[in-house]
């Protein structure tokens, strides 16, 4: 069966109506919208973040996040506010080794970055001269490399701590 985007949207809308989540607008009704934070996670609006101190390669870190919590991935970043929040989490948990993996990469096509959670690439905050592909392809993104809050492209086999994220539907 071949689905076009309009068919898929209609199918999802039907499922939302049947499940009672759709209330006549484009918004989903959340359970609590970040008011109650999952123990051990840091909350910011309707997203939940967990700093993992164990250094892993980018790929192993992504798999770890997926196993940790349903719907979790390496963190995607969509605003200056969220970027600042992740900087705080990183330094709160480890001021000596602030470099962490986040979920961005251009593994599939050089300079076409995507997030592992499938969300839109709508924000970026690169260090000066980045992304650089220094020493060959550097398809994975680390955060806080040399300068707090700024991004760097890196070889994916490097081992760093990382931040996992999951997001719940929310209406404000």
Curated annotation (Swiss-Prot):
InterPro entries: C-type_lectin-like, C-type_lectin-like/link_sf, C-type_lectin/snaclec_domain, C-type_lectin_CS, CTDL_fold. Its main location: secreted. Glycans are attached at residue 93. One of its GO terms (cellular component) is extracellular region. It holds the Pfam family Lectin_C. Anterior part of oviduct. GO terms for molecular function: carbohydrate binding. It is found in: Secreted. Disulfide bonds join 65-164, 140-156. Residues 1-20 form the signal peptide. It comes from the Eukaryota. Gene3D superfamilies: Mannose-Binding Protein A, subunit A. Keywords: Disulfide bond, Glycoprotein, Lectin, Secreted, Signal. Residues 36-172 form the C-type lectin domain. Protein synthesis increases significantly under estradiol stimulation. Heterodimer. May be involved in protection of eggs and embryos against microorganisms. Calcium-dependent lectin with specificity to D-glucose and D-glucosamine. Can agglutinate microorganisms in vivo. This is Lectin. It comes from Pleurodeles waltl (Iberian ribbed newt).
